[in-house]
Amino acid sequence: MRTGTENRPSRSGMGRQKRGKIMLELKDLCLSADAEGGKKDILDHISLTVEDKKFIVITGPNGGGKTTLAKTVMGLAQPTSGSIFYNGEDITSLSITERARRGISYGFQQPPRFKGMKVADLLQIAAGKKLSHDAACSYLTQVGLCARDYVGRDVDTSLSGGEVKRIEIATVLAKNAELMIFDEPEAGIDLWSFARLTETFQQLHDRLEHTIIIISHQERIIRLADEIVLVANGQIAGRGSVDELYPQILTETVRGCNMLEVDKKC
């Protein structure tokens, strides 16, 4: 199945552009956790800037610190040291709720379920306002769900992991946040829905209304990026455009670990 992105040139091939406003800045972030034999550095002096309205894909080997890095930005994990600046404001000590109010949203790799809550109600809570039936259905359609079959369902164990994942992504879209972070949005999603999802990410970026950070190993998502950030062993192992880093991702590994999942069916 084609997504309409296979023959599209990568954004990095469109020429260098003048650097824009810095939306997110991570300064010397460290995060340690208890491990056998002492402390383990999950994040090891990470510094990173993300420009406004850019599409960034963070990739790298499993266990390298990608999810922890994203959770630290959202406030789900607290750094041992270092600082996080969002639109020039130090948000290191702010709560998840305070960061959400400032315009940061997060799509979990393994979303929670909410027994007794309808999908339509969850979308309305995410949007922070009353949603029409058509608006709620639109968000579900964008993530490859048949809206009429899901809008009235409970967000409970009757839904598969892939269904809950897509509903979670729909809530992030409904929030319409300035900075959208998605942790492996492709996980547990079927091929057709994934194709629809990549189109949605492309459309979001084309509108130039949001900054998007996606953690992914998926080739088609990586190819959508303005910039790739490689994270391994808690450090930034590389950063650059798709043209600069994609050949390395295809042919090399970071310290012996494969970084990429290539969908050979498409």
Q: Where are the model-predicted features located?
A:
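Conserved structural motif at the start of ABC-family nucleotide-binding domains
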Residues: L24, I42-L43
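The feature captures the beta-strand-to-loop junction immediately N-terminal to the Walker
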Residues: T59-P61
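Helix-to-loop junction immediately C-terminal to a conserved catalytic motif
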Residues: M74
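Conserved ABC transporter NBD signature motif
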Residues: G82-E89, A135
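ABC ATPase NBD coupling module
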Residues: D90-S105, I249
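Q-loop/switch helix immediately C-terminal to the Walker
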Residues: Q110, G116-S132
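Walker B catalytic motif
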Residues: E184-P185
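Conserved beta-strand-loop-alpha-helix hinge in the C-terminal portion
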Residues: Q235-N258
